[in-house]
Amino acid sequence: MQLQFLGTGAGQPSKARNVSSLVLKLLEEINEVWMFDCGEGTQHQILETTIKPRKISKIFITHLHGDHIFGLPGFLSSRSFQANEEQTNLEIYGPKGIKNFVLSSLRVSGSRLPYRIDFHEFDENSLGKILETDKFTVYADKLDHTIFCVGYRVMQKDLEGTLDADKLREVGVPFGPLFGKVKNGQDIVLEDGTKIIAADYISAPRPGKIIAILGDTRKTSASVRLAVAADVLVHEATYGKGDEKLARNHGHSTNMQAAEVAKEAGAKRLLLNHISARFLAKDISQMRRDASAVFEKVHVVKDLEEVEI
């Protein structure tokens, strides 16, 4: 499981950073890629990666500001060319209005897609659990921005315990079909009458990963709720230390406020993104150092960077 950042800039593209988009790679888990936001130029960024557009099965939009959605029409159209014979349908989750934006853009431009898009829109009254599969659950909660904006909490369900193969061999279980039965939780009886209780040879279920991905926001209690015990928290840091008033006036956060959220939530790692173009390389280093005084495991991400979860 990996996060790859396609755009880490704030508001508008710069030479160093494109506007907002990232993907959660779940190839080993479910052979899918989930995208979060799709700012202008996202499809160009994808060309610099190994991501296959047809593997992107779900897109989660945090809010309807242009730097988070203007890349959708182009990406959706290009995806139809690249899918070839393996047409894969797509689901888009986001605030009310995202369906109208996408369909209007496609209609006005005369674009026709060979795959189906299922829209899942929500407002302030329909948040909470927005998706559940056999392996993942996704929650959305309202943040505090200048327009309706949400953050997402992706929870992987507990993983099956692992089989202790060495222990099985020690008690005389031959490698082969019997191993498979025990792994599937089935008790077996050996030829000599020895009964093997499967539960004795399988470790306890392992907790799944938790990933919190927030849209644009001031510091708010919802951010903490979404990030509780998260393995990774992705939080915006449009402003730096000392710019709290500016951040509040414009509906954003500072690096220090993001660090406070991570600390209060008990998150394991903090990844700062949505970085203003006014921050140069030396400023980014200082931004990380300042935030680490509040929350140690912090990193400022850059475009195309991939982070293992």
Curated annotation (Swiss-Prot):
Q: Which NCBIfam families match?
A: PRK00055.1-3 (NF000801), RNase_Z (TIGR02651)
Keywords, ordered alphabetically: Endonuclease, Hydrolase, Metal-binding, Nuclease, tRNA processing, Zinc
Gene Ontology molecular function, alphabetical: 3'-tRNA processing endoribonuclease activity; zinc ion binding
Its Enzyme Commission number? 3.1.26.11
Q: Where is the active site?
A: 67 (proton acceptor)
The note on the cofactor says:
Binds 2 Zn(2+) ions.
Q: Keyword Hydrolase, does the record have it?
A: yes
- Please give the cofactor(s) recorded in the UniProt entry for this protein: Zn(2+)
* Organism listed in the record: Streptococcus sanguinis (strain SK36)
Binding-site residues, Zn(2+) 1: 63, 65, 145, 216
Indicate whether Thylakoid appears among the record's keywords: no
Query: Subunit composition?
Result: Homodimer.
**What highest taxon heads this organism's lineage?**
Bacteria
Q: Which reaction does it catalyse?
A: Endonucleolytic cleavage of RNA, removing extra 3' nucleotides from tRNA precursor, generating 3' termini of tRNAs. A 3'-hydroxy group is left at the tRNA terminus and a 5'-phosphoryl group is left at the trailer molecule
Family of the protein in this entry: Belongs to the RNase Z family.
Name of the protein in question: Ribonuclease Z
Annotated residues that bind Zn(2+) 2 are located at 67-68, 216, 274
Q: Name one Pfam family in it.
A: Lactamase_B
Group of enzyme by EC: hydrolase
Function, as annotated, reads: Zinc phosphodiesterase, which displays some tRNA 3'-processing endonuclease activity. Probably involved in tRNA maturation, by removing a 3'-trailer from precursor tRNA.
